[in-house]
Amino acid sequence: MPTISLENVTKYYKANKHSRAGRTVEIGVEEVNLTIEQGDFVFVTGSSGAGKSTLLGLISGQLKPDRGTVYLDGKDLSKLLRWNYNRTALMFGKVSPEYALIRKLTVEENLSLAARVGRGKFESNREMHARIQKVLGLVGMTGVEKKHPVEMSIGECRRVELARALINSPPILILDEITASLDDDNIWDIFHLLTEINHKGSTVIMATHASQYVNIMRRRVVTIVDGKIFGDVRQGRYGDVM
């Protein structure tokens, strides 16, 4: 299982017309130093625009730092992606607004599409479809294979998005606001699912606004303020308080 390290990582964005006078760039994150060990469960918290999504994008290799380096098991992530994109990209399972389910495809078709990204991962269609059944069962969504996203609730869609992220058995889950717009029951259901997945060895890195739940979960909490890490606290384990 891989370790992720960020060393002096900075990411800029081109400033828009509403930026302060004279500013040509906006800071996404600045001088970030962070290590995430295998099997960690990390909440990334902060206000809207603080840099949470940028941090997750850098960790997964979706974004390239302007300064500093992101390492995966001691190797430069950007170089790993250049040398073997498919193999490296499959280390990460992602859920974010940018990776919403494709509305015109069924649940099965959405998951099949994600599975085919991992060329060579499945030796046959039968093996791939067995994996689809397994991950849907894992997230409590057995029997929805032929449904389209518009036929499901937001909570059900999030579960399917999580199943899609798990389809290629990635060791690292990157989750950007997976609980957004969900009610309390659905939020707790997602947290319970993620706890089970984490207990099986997966690293879980989750950006969220739901700070009231984060404190109860008693996991590692990284807080970002204006693109900088303001706090990094290990609170214990969820099972300790249940």
Residue ranges and their predicted role:
Residues 60:
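Helix-to-loop junction immediately C-terminal to a conserved catalytic motif
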Residues 76, 125-144:
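Conserved ABC ATPase "signature" region
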Residues 77-93, 125, 199:
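ABC ATPase NBD coupling module
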Residues 148-152, 156:
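Conserved ABC ATPase signature
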Residues 162:
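Hydrophobic anchor residue at the start of the ABC signature
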Residues 169:
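Conserved catalytic motifs of ABC-family nucleotide-binding domains
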Residues 173-176:
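Catalytic Walker B motif of ABC-type/P-loop ATPase nucleotide-binding domains
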